[in-house]
Amino acid sequence: MGKVVGIDLGTTNSCVAVMEGGKPTVIANAEGFRTTPSVVGYAKNGDRLVGQIAKRQAVMNPGNTFYSVKRFIGRKFDEITNEATEVAYSVVKDGNGNVKLDCPAQGKQFAPEEISAQVLRKLVDDASKYLGETVTQAVITVPAYFNDSQRQATKDAGKIAGIEVLRIINEPTAASLAYGLDKKDNETILVFDLGGGTFDVSILEVGEGVFEVLATSGDTHLGGDDFDKKIVDFLAGEFQKAEGIDLRKDKQALQRLTEAAEKAKIELSGVSQTEINLPFITATQDGPKHLDTTLSRAKFEEICSDLIDRCGIPVENAIRDAKIDKSALDEIVLVGGSTRIPAVQEVVKKILGKDPNQGVNPDEVVAVGAAIQGGVLSGEVKDILLLDVSPLSLGVETLGGVMTKIIPRNTTIPTKKSETFSTAVDGQSNVEIHVLQGEREMANDNKSLGTFRLDGIPPAPRGVPQIEVTFDIDANGILNVTAKDRGTGKEQSISITGASTLPDTEVDRMVKEAESNAAADKERREKIDRKNQADSLVYQAEKQITELGDKVPAADKIKAEGLIKDLKEAVAQEDDAKIQTVMPELQQVLYSIGSNMYQQAGAEAGVGAPGAGPEAGTSSGGGDDVIDAEFSEPEK
């Protein structure tokens, strides 16, 4: 089994790690950074850009640069109406109600899974270069509060990227693995994970290699992006009051505002106020307009007060579900870049009555934990037992539109549970099973994971047939449902239809497209490399001919200059076929010139040339040929 990497696929940034010599190592990307922006851009010339290079060009190319895509993955369009308006690119609904991201540069629409797959592909490629071997297997983390659809969609993204996803693991659980790997004493810890787009709280018992999740809670609509949005709205509102222009309606201005807001938020974690300067943010008939203001930490905390208050709700819920007292918590572990916000740290301290532990790197700890789990699955790490839970209740819709729970939230996984149901009317020959996930009493208020039918039930009075419905959650937290007529033994077993927004045929198409794109990308890279080599060869040829001057035979010089001219034209016209033809010809001429020069030098040296015969030079061996010489020491 090859190396299994651990990947934290984040909303804002992603990170990859691996076990080396029994210790987890975070792998730097090709640009030298330990985290990679979860950003994918498509340039007008068709080039696909991923990571830092994509983020850098976002202001100039907002409509084709995709970020915060994790907030859309595995969701229907009706679930993301607010988030869809907060990004500079176009988020649209397809004919099935699924989310699509419009890309004018490519003339097509992407599923969120396709964009996430590009980020995963870069992380795995960078890991492969670091390890010196091809990486094909990974453990990928997801927010603990991700539902079944979002988990399946994340797994699909891995498949599109050409990765075998061995395990989907919850982010707070991964963080606890990294925190507690070397801990011998038993501890009860609370992991407070506030990332770029999601928020999770998990309470675990950790010690002697056992990591047991007692309870988890969260909010998949709360993260650093929301804090950025508050700053954007504040700045845009103030500008609109002064100038009468809403900057949020201009995609380029919105992108600049978003980047400035993120920068200001980060700076306010260390200083009490920060300057925000955006020259030429827009223009009117009167000329260009500039945004120049100061934002204080106090004002930032004021405009984000509702978000900070929301951080407390999942904490209280998790403590209640774990059935423990706050005083029983030994450590509070902060995870995610947004936990650097002082007001967030203060609310944690206020609710739990103790200072949080800041001994882990909030940007890397989740990937480190995923790498440890990868080590467990590959057999490299021994004596670790991970007991995670299902974050939300699972059940079916029953008579009257009620949700009947089969697996309550915070049930340890993997798990399998069954309930027996019957028909609602006389002579009913089939039943429709509507699978739900959530905590509300009525079916319509919960997340619909899909429906399926069990046919062929023999006619009987209502209440007589016995239909056994079995829910089976695997270690990834992904659900399979089976319905069986106990009278006839007929069975219908499915992986939830609708659990993923992408059908298998669509995923397979995207996998093939990604593979063909990978080949095209490789070919494009090879062309660029050849062009660069040709540039370098032209420079070397011109330099060599100039330096050698008259030593170059006239015929060779004329031939070389002609080939240099041809190669320059091929490079300027990006004629790859011509480059491949001319470059070896020029190299051969240069070899010939170099060879002739050395032969000429040897001929001019005559008998004194090295190796010119037995009488050439002086012998260093013993015998009469030794020449004794006396040297006078210079006067000092």
Swiss-Prot record:
GO biological process terms on file: chaperone cofactor-dependent protein refolding; protein refolding
Residues that bear Phosphothreonine: 198
Induction: By stress conditions; heat shock, ultraviolet and oxidative stress. Induced by hyperosmotic stress (0.5 M sorbitol) under control of hik34 and rre1. Induced by salt stress (0.5 M NaCl) under control of hik34 and rre1.
InterPro entries: ATPase_NBD (IPR043129), Chaperone_DnaK (IPR012725), Heat_shock_70_CS (IPR018181), HSP70_C_sf (IPR029048), HSP70_peptide-bd_sf (IPR029047), Hsp_70_fam (IPR013126)
Biased composition, class Low complexity, residue ranges: 604-618
Compositionally biased residues, Acidic residues: 625-636
GO MF term list: ATP binding; ATP hydrolysis activity; ATP-dependent protein folding chaperone; heat shock protein binding; protein folding chaperone; unfolded protein binding
Record Pfam families: HSP70
PANTHER family reported in the protein's UniProt record: HEAT SHOCK PROTEIN 70KDA
Function according to Swiss-Prot or TrEMBL: Acts as a chaperone.
Family the entry assigns: Belongs to the heat shock protein 70 family.
Name this polypeptide is given: Chaperone protein DnaK2
Organism: Synechocystis sp. (strain ATCC 27184 / PCC 6803 / Kazusa)
